[in-house]
Amino acid sequence: MKAIDLIDGPVSVLNRDDVDTDQIIPKQFLKRVERTGFGEFLFFDWAKQPGWDLPSNPILVAGRNFGCGSSREHAPWALEDYGFHAIIAPSFADIFRSNCTKIGLLPVQLSPQACAAIAEAGVIALS
């Protein structure tokens, strides 16, 4: 696991609750055994929708219960491979949170109000 000293920069906002691991990385992309190459498939089904835009910033601000569903490790791998170093949300699925910390992807649980304020500000520094 990599050490985490400071993560700062612009945030990407995914204003959705109950985002499950199947939405983060669909099952058809789980055949790889290495941890790299998943970023291009992140939120694959949503990325095909008109108007979808999720910049590759260091920090993702998400909704409640982020990472629910199956316990696949591929979801944190895809988020990390896409460029995220931290995820800020009001709550996380327990197994997802554990999988994130194992690879050095920082899950930060804050109040819904704090998440909304960070999303509106568009930038944050975490240390």
Listing of model-derived features with the role each one plays in the protein:
Residues 10-12, 22, 57-60, 85-87, ...:
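Structural motif
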Residues 1-56:
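N-terminal beta-alpha supersecondary unit
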Residues 93-98, 114-117:
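Short gly/pro/ser/thr-enriched loop/turn and capping motifs at secondary-structure boundaries
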Residues 3-6, 52-54, 80-81, 116-118, ...:
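Solvent-exposed alpha-helices and their adjacent loops that cap or buttress functional pockets
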Residues 103-127:
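Acidic, glycine-rich flexible loop/linker segments
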Residues 83-96:
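A short glycine-rich beta-strand->turn/loop micro-motif centered on a GG-aromatic cluster
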Residues 58-84:
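Glycine/serine-rich anion-binding loops at beta->alpha junctions
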